[in-house]
Design a protein with these regions (language model features):
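Leu/Val/Ala/Ile-rich N-terminal alpha-helices, chiefly Sec-type signal peptides and the beginnings
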Residues: 22-112
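Primarily heptad-repeat coiled-coil rod domains in cytosolic scaffolding/tethering proteins
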Residues: 55, 62, 66, 104, ...
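Boundary at the C-terminal end of the N-terminal hydrophobic targeting segment
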Residues: 18-20
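Positively charged n-region of N-terminal signal peptides that target proteins for export
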Residues: 1-5
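Extended amphipathic alpha-helical interaction segments
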Residues: 102-202
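Bacterial N-terminal signal peptides
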Residues: 7-15
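A structural signal for well-ordered alpha-helices, especially hydrophobic packing surfaces
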Residues: 71, 75, 79-82, 86, ...
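A cross-kingdom marker for long, charged
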Residues: 198-238
Length: 238
């Protein structure tokens, strides 16, 4: 998901909805800002009778430039958390997508199975943390916009506009798929643990028909869920 390209569109949209008639920035500027800052003469609104059309346009353009910079600052604070957490989740997902994870012969000891069960728990925790950063995104974005001294009414409007661009249906679907995917791997590891060293070196791994059927079903479910998750990642560029 890329949001910097949306900032100008947001500004244009807000400008067409009457926000040009309300303050864009809060009265008191932040103590420390990036290099872009409005000239005092541009921020202070001259009387309408004395302000020429060119001056009004220049003032609005300068305020818009400052606002664009501050929206970028605020959105970066929120998006960096989401991006970092998505990276952690993708890394953990990649471990479990390897075909070796479906082969019982890759486990030399029962302790290795237990270690992977711990990794499954960490995978689930990463999924849960990712869901939380998305869930907190709206509140965190508005707080970040207010910290950038954007006027409250405008901050709320910008927050709503940006948050509406999130692919929420796919985010929820991905969260559900990941929980299901983790559950399948948990079941597979339990199957290996319960049938320790009863498998063959090549397929079919299990002589017991029910165990083999359970194994094959889990492998198919893991593969299918994994493909759906990858499709969503490619579609939405998480």
């Amino acid at each position: 998901m890329r949001f910097h390209s949306l900032i100008l569109a947001v500004l244009v949209l807000l400008g067409t909805q009457g926000f040009a008639q309300i303050p864009l920035l809060s009265p008191s500027p932040p103590l420390a800002r990036r290099s872009v800052s409005p000239n005092p003469s541009a921020v202070q609104r001259p009387s309408v009778s004395k302000e020429t059309e060119a001056e009004r346009k220049a003032r609005f353009q300068e305020l818009t430039a400052v606002l664009k910079d501050r929206i970028a600052e605020a959105s970066d604070k929120v998006m960096s958390k989401i991006i970092d957490q998505e990276k952690d989740l993708r890394m953990r997902l990649s471990y479990f997508e390897k075909q070796d994870r479906l082969d019982p012969n890759t486990f030399a000891t029962k302790e290795e199975i237990q270690n992977w069960q711990k990794l499954v728990d960490q995978f689930q925790a990463s999924r849960d943390k990712t869901a939380k950063v998305y869930g907190d995104a709206s509140e965190n974005l508005e707080a970040a916009l207010l910290e950038e001294k954007i006027a409250p009414a405008l901050a709320t409007a910008i927050r709503k506009e940006i948050i509406s661009t999130f692919p929420w249906d796919d985010i929820v679907k991905k969260n559900d798929l990941l929980t299901t995917y983790v559950g399948y791997h948990r079941q597979l590891l339990s199957l290996f643990d319960q049938n320790w060293q009863t498998w063959n070196s090549a397929k079919p791994y299990f002589a017991d028909q029910k165990t083999e059927a359970d194994y094959e079903k889990l492998c198919q479910q893991i593969t299918s869920a994994g493909k759906e998750i990858d499709t969503l990642y490619k579609k939405d560029n998480f």
